């Protein structure tokens, strides 16, 4: 089915373009949401009359979207979740979780605007795109952590794959092993024993 796009649709086309889409996509998504018209001769003439009004509305919507984008561009959102020692979450962080964090900060975002291919299932800092308008897209970072302290460590860029206590213990064990297996220290001890035997 051929349709005339009334606004920019991602991965499909720009406003005013005539594109061929599957019937179900047109009937269930594009036409009911007012994103397109069937590409008949009457609708083509209707679009030409509506073109100036549609472009003016698009410019207004884009200006509002730019204001929202300036508020959230580069923002870091912290989501606390339970996770295993290896950093795998017991569950996942979904679009709904991200939206609730922005709503708590006073920014309204629709589910369809968050471009998340798959749920986040690991601890760390993840970059996520948000399309506040078909022509305006921003990137935000989502920090997933077990606690607020761990979130701060992640944001500072520290490695959280092991606990700090474990890292300190490993460093001490390595230093002790270095002293124990130091070949020069071992030879000095043998020379002292040989001198004592004589």
Curated annotation (Swiss-Prot):
It holds the Pfam family Ribosomal_L9_C. Disulfide bonds: none annotated. GO terms for molecular function: rRNA binding; structural constituent of ribosome. GO terms for biological process: translation. GO terms for cellular component: ribonucleoprotein complex; ribosome. The keyword Membrane does not apply. Keywords: Ribonucleoprotein, Ribosomal protein, RNA-binding, rRNA-binding. SUPFAM superfamilies: L9 N-domain-like, Ribosomal protein L9 C-domain. HAMAP family: Ribosomal_bL9. This is Large ribosomal subunit protein bL9. It comes from Rhodopseudomonas palustris (strain BisB18).
